[in-house]
Amino acid sequence: MVVIYIMSNKQGLIILISGPSGVGKGTIVSRLLSDNNLKLNVSISATTRKKRASEVEGVHYFFKTKEEFEQMIANNQLLEYANYVNNYYGTPLSLVKEILDKNENLILEIEYQGVIQVLRKGFRTLSIFVLPPSEDELVARLKKRGTENDEVIKHRLEQAVKEYAHRELYDHTIINDDLEKTIEDIKQLILKYNQ
């Protein structure tokens, strides 16, 4: 069942940022969040993953059992969700509505499967697909991280090809060859969509 929410003009915008691993999504989102003029918020995700010692319930995640999470799915209580490495992750709809009802914006760093789910809900959205300047540059960025071996990098590149095939889902595509320009371009899009 698809549930569509009718939003008024006074409600905020959901900004969806996607792109291959290593393109700079996390840095972009972090920098955008520091600009108070954009009225951006992040939502705390729900997950079935085990809580780590340093994590706090309701601060880092809402920790759920598999049964609780599946009940949230059945009750349409999630904006989007995915199963990753045998654990569910999702964005609680109640928090999304709370943010948007305050005429503030929600920003999500999200894969294309999640974008499809969000678009089906009927909220006002701005979706942006971020690309690297080239495949060689993407490989260089992934290697520079120093956290992935060649096999993982190969897998991430295969995933990037799959993600790129879905770029038509997005309102805008931006090539991140200059971080400052990319951030400024996205800021201008957010301001334009919020007029």
UniProtKB/Swiss-Prot annotation:
Q: Where in the cell is it found?
A: Cytoplasm
As its record notes, the protein acts as a catalyst of: GMP + ATP = GDP + ADP
| One MF term in the entry's GO annotations | guanylate kinase activity
Outline the extent of the Guanylate kinase-like domain: 12-191
Q: Name one GO cellular component term.
A: cytosol
The protein here is known as Guanylate kinase
- Cited Pfam families: Guanylate_kin
> What are the record keywords, sorted?
ATP-binding, Cytoplasm, Kinase, Nucleotide-binding, Transferase
Q: Which CDD domains match?
A: GMPK
What gene is behind this protein?
A: gmk
Q: Which residues bind ATP?
A: G19, P20, S21, G22, V23, G24, K25, G26
Q: SMART domains this protein is in?
A: GuKc (SM00072)
Q: Which PANTHER family match?
A: GUANYLATE KINASE, GUANYLATE KINASE-RELATED
EC annotation from Swiss-Prot or TrEMBL: 2.7.4.8
Main enzyme class: transferase
Would you identify the family this protein belongs to, as annotated?
Answer: Belongs to the guanylate kinase family.
* Task of the protein: Essential for recycling GMP and indirectly, cGMP.
